[in-house]
Amino acid sequence: MKFTVIVKQPVYDFVRRLAPEPRRAIKRGLEALRVGRGDRKPLEATLAGYYRLRVGRYRIVYRFISPQAIEAIFAEERSIVYEVFEEEFVRKLRS
């Protein structure tokens, strides 16, 4: 199954600051996601409803906005991606 992948600005900003090879890997990962492949996993607890795509040491957080559309929301290094995303997510909910 093929999906439309909508890449949000925080993902573009993150990818732009990477070196060329990781940048290419992220683009390949997003293409794999578009065709329903890749190392994907649903997130749990306060991040339920979101998913992660693993690309090397990087993670892309995404969600389904329709049965055929995915929104790539956030990307960061594995060591901090979830806490930074959750912090942003909770902050936006409170405002």
Where are these regions (language model features)?
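Conserved catalytic core of Hanks-type protein kinase domains
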Residues: 17, 32-33, 64, 75
